[in-house]
């Protein structure tokens, strides 16, 4: 721990052009996977999930672990993230997609067949309610407020400074 003074016997040379800066696993033979397929997130809904090892684990200059530990932990992080994601999607993707589809269908049905007719009915009845409310206000509330206002208008307040 701390600032290392020994040299690691492992060296890694890499051109900037050959180094992939994405957070996925780099396969040894890129010819085996020539096309990654269409973009499955064209609107960038999950762009916040594009995390790399450096985004999660960061060691300041004053506290570096051994180089071999850093390299092994980086490799283990990337491999476990890749393998565990694939494993979880095999078992959870289809049931969760089904549940999301059912939920979306239920919410759409409720919105189309219950909520919108209720809102439209309220908007149809609202002008009648508005007319009745205006009449109640003019007949009951306006005279009441006027009489209370006249009563309090005759109240006088005198301040004396002693």
UniProtKB/Swiss-Prot annotation:
<dbReference type="GO" id="GO:0060161">
    <property type="term" value="P:positive regulation of dopamine receptor signaling pathway"/>
</dbReference>
<dbReference type="GO" id="GO:0008286">
    <property type="term" value="P:insulin receptor signaling pathway"/>
</dbReference>
<dbReference type="GO" id="GO:0070836">
    <property type="term" value="P:caveola assembly"/>
</dbReference>
<dbReference type="GO" id="GO:0044853">
    <property type="term" value="C:plasma membrane raft"/>
</dbReference>
<feature type="modified residue" description="Phosphotyrosine; by SRC">
    <location>
        <position position="19"/>
    </location>
</feature>
<comment type="similarity">
    <text>Belongs to the caveolin family.</text>
</comment>
<dbReference type="GO" id="GO:0001937">
    <property type="term" value="P:negative regulation of endothelial cell proliferation"/>
</dbReference>
<dbReference type="Pfam" id="PF01146">
    <property type="entry name" value="Caveolin"/>
</dbReference>
<dbReference type="GO" id="GO:0060090">
    <property type="term" value="F:molecular adaptor activity"/>
</dbReference>
<protein>
    <recommendedName>
        <fullName>Caveolin-2</fullName>
    </recommendedName>
</protein>
<dbReference type="InterPro" id="IPR018361">
    <property type="entry name" value="Caveolin_CS"/>
</dbReference>
<keyword id="KW-0597">Phosphoprotein</keyword>
<dbReference type="GO" id="GO:0000139">
    <property type="term" value="C:Golgi membrane"/>
</dbReference>
<dbReference type="GO" id="GO:0048471">
    <property type="term" value="C:perinuclear region of cytoplasm"/>
</dbReference>
<feature type="modified residue" description="Phosphoserine">
    <location>
        <position position="20"/>
    </location>
</feature>
<keyword id="KW-0333">Golgi apparatus</keyword>
<dbReference type="GO" id="GO:0005634">
    <property type="term" value="C:nucleus"/>
</dbReference>
<dbReference type="GO" id="GO:0019901">
    <property type="term" value="F:protein kinase binding"/>
</dbReference>
<comment type="function">
    <text>May act as a scaffolding protein within caveolar membranes. Interacts directly with G-protein alpha subunits and can functionally regulate their activity. Acts as an accessory protein in conjunction with CAV1 in targeting to lipid rafts and driving caveolae formation. Positive regulator of cellular mitogenesis of the MAPK signaling pathway. Required for the insulin-stimulated nuclear translocation and activation of MAPK1 and STAT3, and the subsequent regulation of cell cycle progression.</text>
</comment>
<feature type="intramembrane region" description="Helical">
    <location>
        <begin position="87"/>
        <end position="107"/>
    </location>
</feature>
<keyword id="KW-1003">Cell membrane</keyword>
<feature type="topological domain" description="Cytoplasmic">
    <location>
        <begin position="1"/>
        <end position="86"/>
    </location>
</feature>
<dbReference type="GO" id="GO:0005925">
    <property type="term" value="C:focal adhesion"/>
</dbReference>
<dbReference type="GO" id="GO:0051480">
    <property type="term" value="P:regulation of cytosolic calcium ion concentration"/>
</dbReference>
<keyword id="KW-0539">Nucleus</keyword>
<comment type="subunit">
    <text>Monomer or homodimer. Interacts with CAV1; the interaction forms a stable heterooligomeric complex that is required for targeting to lipid rafts and for caveolae formation. Tyrosine phosphorylated forms do not form heterooligomers with the Tyr-19-phosphorylated form existing as a monomer or dimer. Interacts (tyrosine phosphorylated form) with the SH2 domain-containing proteins, RASA1, NCK1 and SRC. Interacts (tyrosine phosphorylated form) with INSR.</text>
</comment>
<dbReference type="GO" id="GO:0048278">
    <property type="term" value="P:vesicle docking"/>
</dbReference>
<dbReference type="GO" id="GO:0005901">
    <property type="term" value="C:caveola"/>
</dbReference>
<feature type="topological domain" description="Cytoplasmic">
    <location>
        <begin position="108"/>
        <end position="162"/>
    </location>
</feature>
<dbReference type="GO" id="GO:0007029">
    <property type="term" value="P:endoplasmic reticulum organization"/>
</dbReference>
<dbReference type="GO" id="GO:0042383">
    <property type="term" value="C:sarcolemma"/>
</dbReference>
<dbReference type="GO" id="GO:0006906">
    <property type="term" value="P:vesicle fusion"/>
</dbReference>
<dbReference type="GO" id="GO:0031748">
    <property type="term" value="F:D1 dopamine receptor binding"/>
</dbReference>
<dbReference type="GO" id="GO:0007005">
    <property type="term" value="P:mitochondrion organization"/>
</dbReference>
<feature type="modified residue" description="Phosphoserine">
    <location>
        <position position="23"/>
    </location>
</feature>
<dbReference type="GO" id="GO:0048741">
    <property type="term" value="P:skeletal muscle fiber development"/>
</dbReference>
<keyword id="KW-0472">Membrane</keyword>
<dbReference type="GO" id="GO:0031410">
    <property type="term" value="C:cytoplasmic vesicle"/>
</dbReference>
<dbReference type="InterPro" id="IPR001612">
    <property type="entry name" value="Caveolin"/>
</dbReference>
<keyword id="KW-0963">Cytoplasm</keyword>
């Amino acid at each position: 721990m701390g600032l290392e003074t020994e040299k690691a016997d492992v060296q890694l040379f890499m051109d900037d052009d050959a180094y992939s800066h994405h957070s996925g696993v780099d396969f040894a033979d890129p010819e085996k996977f020539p096309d990654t397929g269409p973009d499955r997130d064209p609107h960038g809904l999950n762009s916040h999930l594009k995390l790399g090892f450096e985004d999660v684990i960061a060691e300041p200059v004053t506290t570096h672990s051994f180089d071999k530990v850093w390299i092994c932990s980086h490799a283990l992080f990337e491999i476990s993230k890749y393998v565990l994601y694939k494993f979880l999607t095999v078992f959870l993707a289809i049931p969760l997609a089904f549940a999301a589809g059912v939920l979306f269908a239920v919410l759409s049905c409720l919105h189309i067949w219950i909520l919108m007719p209720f809102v439209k009915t309220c908007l149809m009845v609202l002008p009648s309610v508005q007319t009745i409310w205006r009449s109640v206000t003019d007949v009951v509330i306006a005279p009441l407020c006027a009489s209370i206002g006249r009563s309090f208008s005759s109240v006088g307040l005198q301040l004396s400074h002693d």
